[in-house]
């Protein structure tokens, strides 16, 4: 016989915490939050204390490809998010405004429209672009948000335009605010351990303070082992909430072919120094130019290989690339790379997102 609904709320919080901590799928934990208020409190606490393996967002996904990924990755597509056929909603934005959504609950938050950017106004006035052009769809290169958009004080930081400048908005803002303290083109941004960071093409790291009255980007430290390195740089979150800088290097081998390799540096907040990470130690690292860059414990997170880097490679449509992207895995110990997936569509976008707030 089914238990009365009231009895579900009478389970001890300690018991609920134990049960929820043993759930490995974020969707299961979020579904538990809908049972009653006590379950919501316990499941929310567990949910935000955990690091979940990311979803793979694919902008153009066929049903056959989705079946292929069913035993490897959790896959998201615009159709699953309710945006299929919506010409005003794109992966990074639209002329009418941005959206932020959770991939499980599909909740949506409105953000300031692209037209509030002066660069967009100039392009439209000069007729250099039209509202539905590919250039406008890819105007925002990357977006990251503070921990939860359920918070009244949430903030969103973006990299925008071809010169890769920074702008941000706070809850209720009608337009984007430029952050003009960064001298060089920005390679990547991240929200890590309660702080926004940016890294420019020269390898300078900035702490981005996005206050309403005095927003600024302050250099994090004067020296770094990757300063002036011309390779692609990512800002990533370690599985214990420390800041990582990941260098993606292309080097010529003995056969005069280019080989991809990675270097990782961890920032010590107490000494303001960088330490080279020599091993992923059972972790899997996920990298993508547009999406989340994060390390998780591979053994607890499904079918991912440990000591491996899962990265999106190839031409990035957001920076004018016209070729296909592909998903590959770099095995840390052997230094071997295996291509996992290449989409059929030449303009397909792929990136990693986590089961928290997803920039759209």
Swiss-Prot record:
Domain F-box span(s) in chain numbering: 6-54
Domain of life: Eukaryota
Gene3D superfamilies in the cross-refs: 1.20.1280.50
Protein name per the record: Putative F-box protein At5g55150
Organism field: Arabidopsis thaliana (Mouse-ear cress)
């Amino acid at each position: 016989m089914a238990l009365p609904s009231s009895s579900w709320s009478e389970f001890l919080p300690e018991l609920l915490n134990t049960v929820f901590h043993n759930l490995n799928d974020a969707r299961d934990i979020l579904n538990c939050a809908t049972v009653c208020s006590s379950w919501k409190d316990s499941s929310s606490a567990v949910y935000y204390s955990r690091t979940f393996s990311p979803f793979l967002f694919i902008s153009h996904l066929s049903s056959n490809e989705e079946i292929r990924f069913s035993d490897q990755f959790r896959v998201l597509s615009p159709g699953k998010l309710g945006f299929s056929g919506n010409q005003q909603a794109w992966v990074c934005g639209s002329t009418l405004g941005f959206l932020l959504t959770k991939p499980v609950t599909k909740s949506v938050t409105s953000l300031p429209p692209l037209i509030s950017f002066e660069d967009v106004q100039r392009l439209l006035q000069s007729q250099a672009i039209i509202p539905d052009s590919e250039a406008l769809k890819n105007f925002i290169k990357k977006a990251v948000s503070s921990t939860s958009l359920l918070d009244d004080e949430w903030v969103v930081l973006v990299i925008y335009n071809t010169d890769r400048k920074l702008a941000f908005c706070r809850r209720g803002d009608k337009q984007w605010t430029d952050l003009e303290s960064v001298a060089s083109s920005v390679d990547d941004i991240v929200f890590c351990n309660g702080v926004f960071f940016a890294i420019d093409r020269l390898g300078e790291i900035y702490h981005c303070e996005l206050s309403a009255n005095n927003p600024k980007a302050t250099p994090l430290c004067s020296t770094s082992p990757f300063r002036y390195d011309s390779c692609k740089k990512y800002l990533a979150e370690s599985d214990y909430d420390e800041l990582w800088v990941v260098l993606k290097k292309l080097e010529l081998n003995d056969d005069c072919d280019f080989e991809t390799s990675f270097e990782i540096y961890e920032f010590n907040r107490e000494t303001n120094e960088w330490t080279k990470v020599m091993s992923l130690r059972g972790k899997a690292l996920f990298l993508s130019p547009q999406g989340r860059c994060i390390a998780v414990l591979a053994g607890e997170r499904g079918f991912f290989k440990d000591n491996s880097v899962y990265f999106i490679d190839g031409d990035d449509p957001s920076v004018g690339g016209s070729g296909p992207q592909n998903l590959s895995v770099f095995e840390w110990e052997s230094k071997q790379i295996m291509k996992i997936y290449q989409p059929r569509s030449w303009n397909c976008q792929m990136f990693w997102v986590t089961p928290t707030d997803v920039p759209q």
